[in-house]
Structure formats: structure tokens, C-alpha cells
Amino acid sequence: MHKLAVSALAALAFSGLVQADARIDLGDAQRVTRLFAFPNNCHVICFRDWTLEQTVEHYLTQSVRRDGYANAQVQVSRNSDDHVQALISDVPPSYAEPLRQLLDSGELAYQGATRLNKDGKWAYDWYLFLPLGMALENRRSIELLHFPPDYSLTQAQDYLRSNTTDRWAQLLTFNGIDASQTPAYQTIVDIAPIAAPASAGKDLEGTYTYFSDYQTRMVKQMTLRQGAQPLPMVAFGAPVRSWVQQQYGPKVNVLGLVSISPQAGSQVPVLGANHPSAIWYAADKNNTGGDQDKADAAGLKMMGQDLTAACWQAGMGRNPNAGAKLTLEACATKWQVTQKKQTCELFYRTIRDMTPAQAAAKCNTGSVTRSLRDLRKPVEVEL
């Protein structure tokens, strides 16, 4: 899915604003090297033989495009003091501030990674990877995830290019979000800012405490906005939902709605969700004793939950003033009751790779119809 496209509507929305230039001193080359994971993909031979300046330009250009600044240009240079500076044209002068905040938070992640390595817990195939290249201004919702897969850094050099984010972007489009706008809903905070092999989840469980300062600062910076409602957040997967409970108090179940306070006096709505990739495991017949019907039933159940969570995220992102509980109840009714046949068809189309006609026929069979009767999961709310 091409996530850098900017819709005409978004471009028009920004065209009426008075733009100028944003300038930011990113720090000395040593600092920028570690915060931008430079070089991203070199092992004697570089997959992309970019300089440090080209690497920074790449990620900052991703950000300005995802913020809707279609005409903005990014120039990165190094001065005589070996400081790396960025000039971004046709954006508000204030545009530099969220970037500065992100990199300052990144220093906390670097400090945590350094301690982790000192304690002998850093793996040879891990990379410190901050959430670079995402929208800095045009944020609609926050996604709290576990860790980025290594190929997002080494191959794609795009934090939003992964099977996980691609699938969730698709679910957002099923809930009325234009494909060009999904990056605004997918501002990611990973509790382990480590690009690692997809199989490394268990190994990363002992790393979270090293990044506590980074994690809590990022959640606060990303969700809270001056003079506006906090952005809604979705917590994906069991490790992340457990982290929310340990850090903020309330237990977060799948489709469980809670409220956290990243800062005194603030309340951020948080919805628990499955990990976006969990459905492929749940719907694998090798995990149900070879029983295909049982695997399909498990996948259908999870598809209903995932569509409900994406619906809530889309609705709250469009209107942060909407009632979190009412939005969740409406979404659950839609995808698990009134439109459960569509939920079924989307499951067979996207997970089983059926054609629309094949999916429609499958959803009319007796075994699937019986599974759909049990699709509804009670909504758990703790506010």
C-alpha cells in the first residue's frame, strides 16, 4: 500500500495557510547518526548507498508528505562545526518543534539501549529505530505497538511499511478512511524502539523497563495537544496491553475501553486490540488440530474484533469529541451484528485470498453461518 499519497482534499486544506520555512539544528553528526540509525542498511555493501544527509532528508520528506505539505522541500546540510541542519520550505515555522521533541525523546531511547547493551542484553541483529517519517502535525490517532520489524528499517526505510501496518491501514479504509489519509491515523509508539526480526517478540520482553522514560514521554507527547482533546490511542497485542496496565493502572482487554492519564489532569481514551498480525496465527488450521472450520471460526471472531477496533479508531480520529463508549458500542453492533456478513466476506477475501464471489458463497454455507451467530463479543468498558 502506498502510504505517501496526499489527497487533493488534504492539499487544499493546507493551501490556505500562510507557509514559510522551518529551520532546525538536529545536533552534531554523531547525535544524528545514532538517532537516524545511520547507515540504515549497510553490511560492507550498502543496499542504498546514502549519506547521512540523504538519510535524514528521506525521513523528513516522508513526514512532510504525510502531513499534507505536497510542495514542501527538505534540504539537509552539515556546517563547519559538523552540525546537521534541516531547512524545510513551505511549512509553518512551528513545524520544527514536534521534530525537535521526537529527537529529544529519542535520546532517552538511546540511553536505554546503551544500558541494555551494557547489561549484556542487546542482540547482534537489533537496531535502535525511532518512529521516523511519520506525520508530525496531521495526527488523528495513536497506535501503541510492540516493536518495528527489522525490514521496515533495512529494506523499506519506512516505519509504516510492514505487514502489520499494511493490514491495519486496510481495515481503516474499510471504515471509511481514504487510503491516502491512513498515515494520519497510524502515528506509532513502540514500547521497544528496536527494529528486530519478527520472531523476536519473546526476547524483547525483558527490555521494556530500560525504555520507561522514553515510553511515557512519547505517549504524553503524542496523545496530548495544546487546547484540543487528547488523541485516542489503540493498544495492540498482549505485551502492549500488559504494559499499559503496569504503567497506568487499568487492565486493558481486547475491545476493553479504558482511560489513562499521561499527565495530571488529562484523560486519554485507550482501546485494547489484537495485534494486527495475530489473525494469521489464530486462523491457521495447524493451530486448531487441523480443523479448518475451527480455524475459520477463530479467524472470523478476530476479524470482527479487529474491524470493530479500527472502526472506533477511525470514528474517534475523525471526531475526538465523540463519546468513546458510544462510538465503541456502535462499531461493535455494526461489525459483529448488523453487518456481520460483510465481516465474514472481508475475512475470506483478505485472509483466505478468495474472490468477492467466492467469499460471498462461503459466507452462506451452514458451518460459517453458525460461526457468525457467536461473533458478538461483549464490550468491556472501564472509564
Question: Can you describe what each PLM-predicted range is?
Answer:
Residues 2-9:
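Sec-dependent signal peptide recognition
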Residues 23-77, 81-82, 204-213, 245-382:
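C-terminal capping/extension of enzyme domains
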Residues 23-232, 238-245, 274-281:
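A polyanion-binding, active-site-adjacent surface
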Residues 15-17:
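N-terminal signal peptide c-region/cleavage motif recognized by signal peptidases
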